Each structure stands twice: as structure tokens, then as C-alpha cells.
């Protein structure tokens, strides 16, 4: 019985080492995103609820295709902290290595407007960002009929909420 535990312990240790090595390699490759392989439209204003300007950074691949599929990306931070800059490397990676137009979105935080923003407003921001993308992404060579959403942590929650509200998106 004791011997089996040692084998699992060793296997677990080796698995963690392998995973950490893969993560380090992925981080290095993300840090080497070639800026000549995408065009960046920084701080594109997409809404101004209650006077707070909401922006997104739009990364467009430069491979010469007529249009590209689109990924709308929401950052994490517990709806309280951070902005889209924490997703810059991931956005550039998707644009350069997967040929997506990436919309890296800022949304209101719970701490904005003297802590008066609520979670429903943040969810509406996320949904509004996707609606804006569908209406405007052709200006950035994005295909409005091929839009996906993703996010990290709180951003993943917002992505799930957008998907759940999908029946409110137009069918095209």
C-alpha cells in the first residue's frame, strides 16, 4: 500500500513538472508575438454608459485574408479590478497564430462610479460589446457571422452570460 502511494506521488510530481514546463514554453511563445503580424486599433470607443467611456483593443491579422473569424475577449478580476491590458498577450497570440480578429474588451467594474455599478450592468456591458462587434467588426476585416466569446475568471462568467443571452442576438 505504501509503495503505491510513492508511485502516485512520483507520477504527480512528474506531471506537475511537465505542466509547468509546458506553461513556461507557452508563456515564452506568447511573449514573442510579432507585432508585424497584426494591426492594433487601440482604445476603440464602443459605449459610454453614465459618462464612463468603454473601449476595446482590436487586433486584426495581417495575412491578407478578406475576412477573419472574431473572438470577443473579456478580462478577469472579480468584476472589481484589472482592465483589458491583462489579456494583451493572449489577444495578440490569437491574432498572430490563429488568424482571428480579437476584440479585447473593457467593461465597467463594480468599483466604478463610487461603487454604484451592479453585476447586471456589467453583464449588459458584455452583451453590448458583442452587439457592437456584430454591427462594426466588418470595418476591421472581421466576419460578423463568425463571432465567439471567451474570457478569464470573471470574464469567463461574462462570456457564459452572453451565450445564455444569445437569443437576443440577431440570427445572422
Can you say where each PLM-predicted feature lies in the sequence?
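Primarily recognizes the serine-hydrolase "nucleophile elbow" in alpha/beta-hydrolase
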Residues: 128-172
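N-terminal cap/lid segment of alpha/beta-hydrolase-fold proteins
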Residues: 27-66
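N-terminal carbohydrate-binding/catalytic regions of secreted carbohydrate-active enzymes
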Residues: 57-60, 67, 81-93
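Bacterial N-terminal signal peptides that target proteins for export
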Residues: 2-12
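C-terminal motif of bacterial Sec signal peptides marking the signal peptidase cleavage site
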Residues: 19-22
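A fold-wide structural signal in alpha/beta-hydrolase
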Residues: 70, 99-106
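Short beta-strand element of the alpha/beta-hydrolase
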Residues: 67-76
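Catalytic nucleophile-loop/oxyanion-hole region of alpha/beta-hydrolase
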Residues: 47, 83-84, 90, 103-144
